Amino acid sequence: MRRLKTRRMIAAIGAALAVMTAGAIYTVANPFTASAAIACSPAWSASKVYVGGDTASHNGTEYRAKWWTQGETPGTTGEWGVWESKGACGGDTNPTQSQSPTQQPTEEPTGNPGGGDKINAAYFTEWGVYGRNYHVKNIVSSGSAEDLTTINYAFGNVKNGQCTLDDSYAAIDKAYTADQSVDGKADTWDQPLRGNFNQLIKLKEMYPHIKVVWSFGGWTYSGGFGQAAQNPAAFAESCYNLLHDARWNGLFDGIDIDWEYPNACGLTCDTSGTQAFTNLMKALRAKFGSELVTAAITADGTSGGKIDLGGYGTAAQYVDYYQVMTYDYFGAWDKDGPTAPHSALSSFSGQPIAGFDSATAIAKLKSLGIPSSKLLLGIGYYGRGWTGVTQSAPGGSATGPAPGTYEAGIEDYKVLVSKCPATGTVGGTAYAYCNGEWWSYDTPATIATKTAWANSQGLGGAFAWELSGDTSNGALVSAIANGLD
C-alpha cells in the first residue's frame, strides 16, 4: 500500500471520529492523576533556541516545543502554534527576559488541518535527462511517485508573447529502451510520441493520483513575459493550445507560471507594472477554466522588495496556489561571504539582510490577503556553499564559491549528505563545515521542522526544486510527505 494512501486512510478515520463527536473534542481527566501537577521544566527564555521536543515552563504551565522556535511566548501561539500545552506544573520561574514573538501566525489556518490532502509538488527538469541522467523512471525507482501529488515539468519557453516548447528532443522525441522506460517497454521508431512526455503519460497511468503541470519561464526564460503581458488573452490562448496539443492531450493538468520577476529584476528587468502579473493570471484562468493555474513566486520579504512590486495579492484570486521560492536567499555570488543559510525558515542572529527568510515572506504574502491554503513552502534539494572559510559557525568570511558538480557554489543534497554532512542548524535549516567549505542545505530533520511550521500556518503544502537533487531512495520527497498533515 502506498504511503500516501496510508496517510489518507488515517486522516479519513480521524475525520470520521471528529464527525461522531459533532466537531467537539472532549478530554476526560484521569481521576488518579488529574490532581497531580507536572514538574516544571526550566522557565521559558525569549533568547533561547528551542527545537522539537524541548520543554519549558511559563506562568505555571508546562509546554513542549513542536519544532524550532525562538522568542515565541508559550500560551500565545494558539492551537496550531509551536508550543503544545502539557497542563499545569508545580512551580514556575518567570523568565528574566521577555519579548513579543518574532513570528506569529497572521491568521488562523485556512487550509485543511489534517486531511492528508496537502500538496507535495516537485519540479522535474527537461534538461536533467542529459548530464544529470535523471529520467521519469527515477521518480518511480526512488519511491517518490508514491509520495508526490504534483510534478512541475520545467521549463517551457516564452517567445514572441507565446508559450513554446523548448527542447523538443528531450520532451517528445528521445527514444527510451526497455530498461530506461517507466513501464519496462521500449519506444519504437515509428510511435508518434516519445521522450519525457510519453514517459510522464505512462507514469500517470501507473500513479493516477499524480498531477502533471507544465511550468513556463524560470530564471532563464522569464524575459519573454513582458511581451506576453501586453496581450494576455493571446498568451493564454497559445499556452492552452500547446498544453492540449493532440500528440499529448491529457498529459497536463494545468499550467505553472514562473515569472522571475514581474515589475522587478531577475536575469532581466521587467517594467510591466504592478497590474501585469494579475492581468496575465486572469487571462490564464479565463482560458484554462477548472484546470490548475499556479505560479512560482518570489520570497523576497524585504520592505519595498519583489513581493511588494509583483501584484501577487490581487492576482491570488485567479490562481490555485503560489509556490513561494523560499530558497536562494544567500550564496557565493557574494564570494567573500558572510556565510549564511540560503533557505532559512526564520530570522537568525547575524542575518545579512532582514526579510530574507521564509517566515517573513509568508507573513508578508498573507498580509496581502492571500489565503494560507494558497501558499506552498519551497524546499531546495541542494545546498549553496563557499570555500576558504575558517569558521564553522555562520557569518564567516570566504574566498569564493565552493566547487560543485555542475556549477561552483551549488551542490545536490545527494552529494552533500555524505561529502559534507550537517554540523549544525541556523534559522531552521542545516549547515555544514568541512575542509574549509561551508554549506547550507535542508535535511530530512530540517524538513520535518519546516513542514510542521507549514502545517501550523495552514499552508497548502510544500514544493521542491528539483527532483534530481534527492537521493536514490527519495529521502527528501518522503520527508516532506511524512511531515505534511
Predicted regions and their residues:
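N-terminal export and membrane-targeting signals
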Residues: 1-17
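Extracellular low-complexity, Gly/Ser/Thr-rich intrinsically disordered linkers
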Residues: 62, 129, 414-485
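Conserved, mostly hydrophobic/aromatic
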Residues: 53, 151, 214, 257, ...
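Tryptophan-rich substrate-binding surfaces of secreted polymer-degrading and adhesive proteins
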Residues: 7-12, 24-112
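Active-site-proximal beta-strand/loop segments in catalytic clefts of secreted hydrolases
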Residues: 66-68, 122-129, 153-158, 215-219, ...
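Substrate-binding surface in catalytic domains of secreted glycosidases
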Residues: 166-184, 262-411
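Glycan-recognition patch characteristic of GH18 chitinases/ENGases
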Residues: 114-245
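Active-site groove signature of glycoside hydrolases
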Residues: 239-271, 328
